[in-house]
Amino acid sequence: MKWIVKWHEKELRSSIDRFKEMACAIDPTRDPIEVLKSTIHVSYSTPEEMFNDMKKFLEIARDHASKYIDLPQDIVCEVTGVREFEKDIYPMGYAGVPDPLEKETKCMIALNQYNYRAFSRGWLMMMAIHEAYYGHNIHWIKVGLADIPESFKIPSDIGSPLAEGLAHRGEELLQDIYGDKSFPLLVAWRRVHTALRVYIEINMFLYNKITPEDAVKLYMNIMGFDEQTAKGLVEAHLENRGYNLCYLAGYKMIEEYRSKLRDLDEKTFSNTLFSAGFISIRNVKKVLDIKEDMPWEKD
């Protein structure tokens, strides 16, 4: 935790600055959030348009992810809507990950057709990576097919930093795959999002410097979210304390490991991490046979 505290404020500032610089390069006359919303983060007009785009983005993500990780030939990721009773439970849908113990290679992504106006082209591009290819679905499949103890194939909270860190890493690793020059802007905005999550976790729960109401305002002012969305995000902080650290902290830990293994090719590195099982991200050091002390071990 001391390691995260050291960098959390600087990370948020640098993420915001990078997002603003990228938006300014596209259109220096407008607010960065407005640039985002007018280019890559435009709402869909119909559910059908949303579903068709998601299928297309999944195909693109699969083709390009295979450059970074070995994928089973028979992998299938279907796109479906949510059931009516799920529409309020999953406002943005969910990833239907396969059962690793059954060695399944079929997975799915459910999009909330009742809330289609909340989706944009850029958000679906990001979901196709984060939830599927170089993200959660392929992670669960790789774990299921790996030659590791069965106990390592049982999902658990201890594996969350590795799982979310890998999926978040994929967003930046594959940000150029769609041939859309504005998608990296959404990826930069997403980085602000995960950095703000860390900032709120630390200042709301560790230091007690901000209230939930303050956190809602931060999500609205920094991210451009409406009040309802911001309140939902803060509610997630309150219901699952600590989880929102997993995305960015996990990603940064993975990159620290990567920096120690520059002679290792990317595909071998990715295959190793995706097939390690649902283990503590600290134990990844043993899997990769890294002898040096990591930054979080020095605090």
Task: State each model region's role.
Residues 1-299:
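N-terminal maturation segment of proteins
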